[in-house]
Amino acid sequence: MAHEIVDGSSMQRALTRITYEIIEQNKGVDNLVFVGIKTRGVYLAQRLAKRMEQLEGVKVPVGSLDITLYRDDRHQPDHHVEPTVNATDVDVDINDKHVILVDDVLYTGRTVRAALDALMDLGRPKRISLAVLVDRGHRELPIRPDFVGKNIPTSNSETVHVAVEEYDGHEDISLENRK
């Protein structure tokens, strides 16, 4: 059974902090594009863009990225079943832009690796940064986030669930032991 470790208001504060860090490190918002990794990363990217518009008065474009076909584990456990592919929606030219890739949880790094491959098929950004709401450790690839909402050390037998209002109908971060 999952138990809440971060409530909705703490999630909002973490996203606001990430927004300020992005503005500070980027020295403004020029040439920024948020690209959320489906599913919850898209909603988080939209929130970051909305908060940035409130703070800076500039509307930052937001896209969504489906990485299904780029995953290195897509044929496991049954390699005969084809994956369900959702649409990638990046309506802005990412060439020579600073792309902020957004995801809910960073774990092994494999999702981010797949997202980088998918992103490079769309263009050649000047720079790519990674923003995650939760970094839980246990990397299998040399990937490190640039912006982190919460560092939550976990064991490999635990699962981190991020719930967002837009998709789940409630908002929190919970931890569950896998059996």
Curated annotation (Swiss-Prot):
Q: Which UniProt keywords apply?
A: Glycosyltransferase, RNA-binding, Transcription, Transcription regulation, Transcription termination, Transferase
Q: Which cysteines are joined by disulfide bonds?
A: none
Task: Please tell me which stretches of this chain the record labels as motif PRPP-binding.
Answer: 99-111
Mention one GO molecular function: RNA binding
Which residue spans traverse the membrane? none
Keyword Nucleotide-binding listed? The answer is no
Give the GO biological process terms.
DNA-templated transcription termination
Pfam families attached here? Answer: Pribosyltran
Q: Identify the EC number(s).
A: 2.4.2.9
Concerning SUPFAM superfamilies, the annotation shows: PRTase-like
The record's annotation in Gene3D superfamilies points to: 3.40.50.2020
Describe its assembly.
Homodimer and homohexamer; in equilibrium.
What HAMAP family would the database entry show? Answer: PyrR (MF_01219)
Do you know which PANTHER family this protein is assigned to?
BIFUNCTIONAL PROTEIN PYRR
Q: What does this protein do?
A: Regulates transcriptional attenuation of the pyrimidine nucleotide (pyr) operon by binding in a uridine-dependent manner to specific sites on pyr mRNA. This disrupts an antiterminator hairpin in the RNA and favors formation of a downstream transcription terminator, leading to a reduced expression of downstream genes. Also displays a weak uracil phosphoribosyltransferase activity which is not physiologically significant.
What protein is this chain from? Bifunctional protein PyrR
Which species is this UniProt entry from? Limosilactobacillus fermentum (strain NBRC 3956 / LMG 18251)
Q: What is the lineage of its organism?
A: Bacteria, Bacillati, Bacillota, Bacilli, Lactobacillales
